[in-house]
């Protein structure tokens, strides 16, 4: 069982533990997010992971065509696609992930509260290339174990942090990426200043992804100056898809 949690995180973890494994034969190759980010950076672009979510703490509640959205992002230079699959609080689904996997040739992140191996089985089977492991909801032993399990499939993993305690845990492992979430998962408050501070504490040889609260070119430039290698953006792109042309 994941570490002791409070409030809505307890509910979301319990819901995650009870989700069934999706039995399906994967029908797409694995696309590397790491290679995609490095390629974008070498081309002088801002590597943007465009996120699709139906609902979130930011207040967004969208019903736009998922296939049209992700193909627009792919055609306009997105480095990867993130798909929210958590059901209870974000109204996501594995079906959303499957739709994206069938329609883009970009690395796909299954954005969820991963706490069990069967969720990783499902991610691989459906067609994800990357999973999210949130340090805040896992013990360090669980984090290491789930990371190794994901790697056994050839998947990449983002270890997400939101404070210095999480950062200490993330730096003890040789993980593919460290994602810095501007949103505090307990209070749901967003602080890009905290993101910048944490980014500056991460060694330069680690690939770092800034997550949440990003809406302007200036946000990206400031985060990049603090050490971010890539930017996971959802709400602002869902509200205005053309914004990717400005941010890229």
UniProtKB/Swiss-Prot annotation:
Superkingdom field: Archaea
Pfam families per the UniProt record, alphabetical: IGPS
Keyword Transferase on entry: no
Metabolic or biological pathway: Amino-acid biosynthesis; L-tryptophan biosynthesis; L-tryptophan from chorismate: step 4/5
GO biological process, one term: L-tryptophan biosynthetic process
EC number from the UniProt entry: 4.1.1.48
Gene Ontology molecular-function annotations: indole-3-glycerol-phosphate synthase activity; phosphoribosylanthranilate isomerase activity
Enzyme class: lyase
Catalysis performed (reactions): 1-(2-carboxyphenylamino)-1-deoxy-D-ribulose 5-phosphate + H(+) = (1S,2R)-1-C-(indol-3-yl)glycerol 3-phosphate + CO2 + H2O
Keywords: Amino-acid biosynthesis, Aromatic amino acid biosynthesis, Decarboxylase, Lyase, Tryptophan biosynthesis
SUPFAM superfamilies: Ribulose-phoshate binding barrel (SSF51366)
Residues that span the membrane, as ranges: none
Family: Belongs to the TrpC family.
HAMAP family registered for this protein in UniProt: IGPS_A (MF_00134_A)
Record's protein name: Indole-3-glycerol phosphate synthase
Organism of derivation: Sulfolobus acidocaldarius (strain ATCC 33909 / DSM 639 / JCM 8929 / NBRC 15157 / NCIMB 11770)
